[in-house]
Amino acid sequence: MDEKDVILSNGLKVHYYEWPGSKPALIFLHPSSGYGRMWEATANHLGSRFHIYAIDQRGHGSSGRPDGDYSAEEYADDLRLFLTAVGVDKAILAGQSLGGRVGIVFAAVHPERTMGLALVGGPHLSNFFPTREAVLGVLAASQRMLESETEFASKDAALAYLRKLRPRDREEALRHRVEHNLAQAGTGWAVKYDKVRVALGLAHMADDLKKYALRTTCPVAILRGNHSSELTLEEAKRVAGFWKNASVIDVEGDYALQMENPPGLAEALIRWTV
């Protein structure tokens, strides 16, 4: 694994991780409050089957935190500029939550550069059925992010907080978050994301993305956790109908499959792309 920085033509510094391998390129896009290296275990299980990139998206990790609307459209334009900067013409995209929204927009707007789109954990229903109730849920999630703890006296304190916040994650995955998504701040530790920017991005979970799905021509895989708390099988099949060529593939787990079940996610990606 190589760790690098690149300055995009819009001035954004993007920090990213690269696992050299065979073509095609596979781009991993993390969720809100996530970080590029959270795909590390999945990338290692994939081996050299793909040339893999995992990005710290704007507002996250060691990438820049400029002003902006932090919409999927803005992130998708960052992705376009990133691919150009690193010399990738076409790629398979795999994203979870925020990363999935970015992929949905990118695949529709840049079909000539998208070989396939994998939605890890599945898309948010609120992006396809933005009912009043769904919007209330989105705004509540955004508010919870604003109120979340972001500074800790020690790594042990951060780990204890994450255990309560993410009870489904493996202990190894929680420790990975502590090791790679915190930075020293004074005498303690702080998360490596801007929670105000993240909260703004979360508010876009009420944006209607159906128009993008309807324009997409590449194959789409909804990689749903088989005991998902976010998306039932029936809901996944219903949302899949908005794409011309989408399939639903169940993977052992709940939602953050790259943290809960990296080998299972890697196997599903391999089967889908064969």
Spans of features found by a protein language model:
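Conserved acidic catalytic loop of the alpha/beta-hydrolase fold
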Residues: 74-91
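A catalytic-pocket lid/entrance helix-loop region that shapes and gates access to the active site
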Residues: 123, 127-151
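Conserved alpha/beta-hydrolase catalytic His-Asp/Glu region
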Residues: 149-207
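Conserved serine/cysteine hydrolase catalytic core
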Residues: 184-241
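Catalytic histidine neighborhood in serine/cysteine hydrolases
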Residues: 242-255
